[in-house]
């Protein structure tokens, strides 16, 4: 998403500089994928948030995958089919090639940057969350959209977990 810095004033009183971040919603989807429709889920942790298959019951996915569009709110069948298709092991849920159902190149490039940056507050972390999944209605492909990238390029994630040796988060950009 796009972002910029904004000086915030409340009642003519300066509050500081804040980050103004574009929301991931139908407007975002339309600007990136050409149409505001499709299944969009926000992932905030819980069972299956690591894209692990936990069966065919939609109730197993509701806590982790919050519907953000009407199409996503209509059911979890396509999401479950996707997760079952990428699950390791002998999954009979979906036998499609991964590239036909997932924007794999974009995902791998994003993962490379996130792992290098120590973005452990994401799918790459110990408690996967802070991302969206979007399924394009025409292509049927799923797209990974990272979100809330505030824990990265730090010497220690959450003040405890070493991330990058020799990095100092206080260095100027």
Residue ranges and their predicted role:
Residues 1-173:
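Phosphate/dinucleotide-binding and metal-coordinating scaffold of catalytic cores
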